[in-house]
Structure formats: C-alpha cells, structure tokens
Amino acid sequence: MKLKKAERRQAIQKAIELNPFITDSELCEQFEVSIQTIRLDRTNLSIPELRKRIKLVAEQNYEQIRALEANEVVGDLIQVEPNISAQSLIEITEESVFTKTQIARGHVLFAQANSLCVALIHKSTVLTQESNVAFIEKVKLNDTVRAEAHVVNKTSHHYVIEVNSYVRDTIVFKGTFKMFYISEDE
C-alpha cells in the first residue's frame, strides 16, 4: 500500500535520519516509488544527496584524527571512536578498477583499511608494522565499500586492529593490522 505524499516524505526523512547512508535506489524499493519521486521528496525536505550527506558526516569526524590529515584518509570517515573503533566509506570509481574487468584493484581496499587503522589511533605518530589480509569477494565499479575497524588488543606501543569491509551486507575484505605508535611525550 502506497503512502500519501506527506506521510511518505515524513517516512523518508525518518529513514534517512536512521541511516544517513541509505541510497535513493534503496528508498525507491522501500517506498515503491520512482527515483524521481524520491529526489523530489528529498529536495522538498532539504535533504542533500547521498554524497553530500557522507561528506557532512565525514567532516565532523576528521577533527578527531591526530596521525593523518583529513586528505590522507582513503575514503570518507563516517564514524570514529578514538582508540576503539572507526568506519569509512569509499565509492569505487573508474580510477580504482582494472579497465578490462571493472573489478577494484586490491590496493584500494587495503589502503582504505590501513588508513582507517591509522585514523582510529589517537596518537601523533602511527605506522603499520604488519598486516594479514584476505580479499573475500570481488568489488566492482560503482560499489560502495564500508570498512569497519575495531581494536582487539593494545600494548605499550602497539594496537592490533581487525578490519572487515563490506559491499552492502557481503564481506569483501578482512584484515588484521598490527600498528606501532609513539606518544607525544616520547
């Protein structure tokens, strides 16, 4: 059963508040309307498109990073709890894929995960000491990859961080990173 325009707009606003990373296509499916209708409703509600919503969330999180400049993070940092966990998103573009197969280059997924680990640690100097990674599924042109990093262990100069990357709900990459850090007072 389709909702009336006012009810649908209210429901769209609530859906985006609950998940600011929901796509217009996903909203189309959820509310059984065309993409043009979703775009008109978003415009009427003064809700920016997905890319702008991601950038707004990312800008708020960059302030919490100490070891990297915002432009050094691969992907958009969408959540960071210093020394505990972080998440980022990256859209796979033409520059990120092999021309013939349209499959993402592995170093892009690795760079997203690795820079997320550096951004997560709230120290001035953070370096990757070792990593163990696995590429689980292929990632294609225009996919959006969500990387989630969680600290699993901390010692006097190291963090061990697990990273899982997803396209929608499918895991595409996983890795364990041992990160070396130096405190400012050292």
Curated annotation (Swiss-Prot):
**Keyword list, A-Z:** DNA-binding, Fatty acid biosynthesis, Fatty acid metabolism, Lipid biosynthesis, Lipid metabolism, Repressor, Transcription, Transcription regulation
Q: Where is the MaoC-like domain?
A: 98-168
The GO terms this record gives for MF are: DNA binding; DNA-binding transcription factor activity
**Which HAMAP family has this protein been placed in?**
Transcrip_fact_FapR
What does this protein's UniProt record list under function?
Transcriptional factor involved in regulation of membrane lipid biosynthesis by repressing genes involved in fatty acid and phospholipid metabolism.
What protein family is recorded? Belongs to the FapR family.
Query: What's the protein called, per UniProt?
Result: Transcription factor FapR
Organism expressing this protein natively: Staphylococcus haemolyticus (strain JCSC1435)
